[in-house]
Amino acid sequence: MTIRIAINGFGRIGRNVLRALYESGRQTQMRVVAINELAAAEGMAHLLQYDTCHGRFAWSVRQQDDWLWIGDDRIRLLHRPQIADLPWEALQVDVVLECSGVYGSRADGEAHLLAGAGKVLFSHPGGHDLDATVVYGVNQESLLAEHRIVSNASCTTNCIIPVIKLLDDAFAIESGAVTTIHSSMNDQQVIDAYHPDLRRTRAASHSIIPVDTKLAAGIARVLPQFRDRFEAISVRVPTLNVTAIDLSVSVRTPVRVEQVNHLLQKAASTAFHGIVDYTELPLVSTDFNHDPHSAIVDGTQTRVSGRHLIKTLVWCDNEWGFANRMLDTTLAMARAVSNAS
């Protein structure tokens, strides 16, 4: 049975989810029946078709009034500011992909359910009272049929947690620290302008800008054994897309660089195939643009100090990789229902 999807919020993640659905060939498994976005329909169609990061969409795109066609597939366009006014019941929506970045509480999820949706998947971390937080490849098998309000965590959480789990299973992590080197985002300024965070008042293209991150809390939410054992900081850098994560962990088992790289390279071709990739090529951030993996380990940058301190560099396309995981988790939510019946 084809899963009927609605996308609420057609920004960076919403558009990339729709593009990824077609580029991955999964539109027979999932069908987008509606998109709710306050912007004009003409702009929605234009930005879907032409993207500075990811290039021109390979599928034909046509828009007329409040309808969008991708090839022969027709999608209804809505422009409603209140969740309660969305016609999810009439459209028989199975899963709402909540990509607005505005909503993240259980009450917000329940509003979608009251509007008639079967389930809700947030494209960002939500409150502790959600039914589940999923990092695909690590804990999607814990999804139950009764889990109706789910978070897909964050792009950086999806990037680093598979690597942390692999290192912990093999070498027993005691503690860790993470530095996220993240591309500029749309909550920053093109030129100096007001923002509640004084660092984000500054022009994104001219500075490396430290910002707050809840990544350590996100790690603990999915891997609770690491509560109070990880710290994280984040800086935004003046690039358009792709993020690097510097991960340092202290482990109980004495290790060497070769052992760490062997572990991660093997996982990329076996248990974490399609989620984690591994490279030893002399690549830079732009080379990972449009990469669908959650994490790409750069084996040339692995270091071990004193046999017990491991440092790794992990890349991710913070848009495209995460968009693909949104689709994976949507299918996992549907499988949980199917397995229970």
From Swiss-Prot:
GO terms for biological process: pyridoxal phosphate biosynthetic process; pyridoxine biosynthetic process. It is found in: Cytoplasm. Gene3D superfamilies: Dihydrodipicolinate Reductase, domain 2, NAD(P)-binding Rossmann-like Domain. It holds the Pfam family Gp_dh_C. This is D-erythrose-4-phosphate dehydrogenase. It comes from Edwardsiella ictaluri (strain 93-146). NAD(+) binds at residues 12-13, 318. Its EC number is 1.2.1.72. CDD domains: GAPDH_C_E4PDH (cd23937), GAPDH_N_E4PDH (cd17892). It catalyses: D-erythrose 4-phosphate + NAD(+) + H2O = 4-phospho-D-erythronate + NADH + 2 H(+). The record marks 182 as: Activates thiol group during catalysis.
